[in-house]
UniProtKB/Swiss-Prot annotation:
Pfam families: FAD_binding_6 (PF00970), NAD_binding_1 (PF00175). The chain crosses the membrane at residues 2-22. It comes from Phaeosphaeria nodorum (strain SN15 / ATCC MYA-4574 / FGSC 10173) (Glume blotch fungus). This is NADH-cytochrome b5 reductase 1. It is found in: Mitochondrion outer membrane.
């Protein structure tokens, strides 16, 4: 039987198509998070913001990989720490999103009694952190409400920033959600990511940020003291079926905000928040 090169043509086409398809698949974005299994990610970069706060960038396996974290959810960090009987696990919300490929960023403030925060602060570039997720009841979807009111304190800004960025990114696809954010801190230098927040507010008229300080500098025009029911009434949307209040901050602040929002007519915040709650506490 004579050999015909044309007879191999269909197989060549199939092979090329298969290889091409594999290349497209292999070069695409892959979600790396596993909800029930810790994985190790290498610290790639550390950006110090203050004496006790930094942004930690962790490397994903490939430059095209994404974390795979729904907007509004968080991850768990785990570490075996001397003196602790079992692995210590704490939750953090990245300030990056799946728009950022090849890495994820965590804003972490170290506390004297914070086991995980101190552990991360002592990590050197090249060392690894155990991570799993996603976790959490909050998942943002475009136009899920007409208006968000947000109340945050300190590093409680992280889930708020994640949601705000997603809303503003979605403007071109029809996301019309309004956002008013009350961000409370002790001193001016404690206002984390202020430049980012101000830039977002300048860019988008439907996002407004209201700063509150315990120790304001001379000439300060923002709020002063603790966040009160009067501040919430003045700055945030009134109770309505298409309004949701998000709260994240130190436990005493969260407890106070639950009482304040209830006094203003919002639905009573539950001990453990669910997505459908009018007042959702991270």
């Amino acid at each position: 039987m004579a050999f015909s090169p044309q007879a191999l043509l269909p197989y060549v086409v199939l092979f090329v198509a298969a290889v091409g398809g594999w290349k497209v698949y292999s070069s695409g974005s892959k979600k790396v998070l596993k909800p029930n299994e810790f994985q190790e990610f290498e610290l790639e970069e550390k950006t110090v913001l203050s004496h006790n706060t930094a942004i930690y960038r962790f490397k994903l396996p490939r430059k095209t990989d994404i974390l795979g974290l729904p907007i509004g959810q968080h991850i768990s960090l785990g570490a075996t720490i001397e003196g602790q009987p079992k692995e210590v696990v704490r939750s953090y919300t990245p300030i990056s999103s799946d728009e950022d490929k090849g890495h994820f960023d965590l804003l972490i403030k170290s506390y004297p009694t914070g086991n995980i925060s101190k552990y991360v602060a002592n990590l050197k570039v090249g060392e690894k952190m155990r991570v799993k997720g996603p976790k959490g009841a909050m998942v943002y979807t475009p136009n899920m409400v007409r208006h968000f009111g947000m109340i945050s304190g300190g590093t409680g800004i992280t889930p708020m920033l994640q949601v705000v960025k997603a809303i503003i990114r979605g403007r071109g696809q029809g996301d019309t959600t309004e956002v008013d954010l009350i961000f409370a801190n002790v001193n001016p230098e404690d206002i984390l990511l202020k430049e980012d927040l101000d830039a977002l507010a300048a860019k988008d008229p439907k996002f407004r940020v209201h700063y509150v300080l315990n120790n304001p500098p001379e000439g300060w025009t923002g709020g002063v003291g603790f966040v009160t029911a009067d501040m919430i009434k003045e700055k945030l949307p009134a109770p309505a079926s298409d309004v949701k209040i998000l709260v994240c901050g130190p436990p005493p602040m969260v407890a106070a905000m639950k009482k304040a929002t209830e006094s203003l007519g919002y639905a009573k915040a539950k001990p453990v928040s669910k997505l459908e709650d009018q007042v959702f506490c991270f």
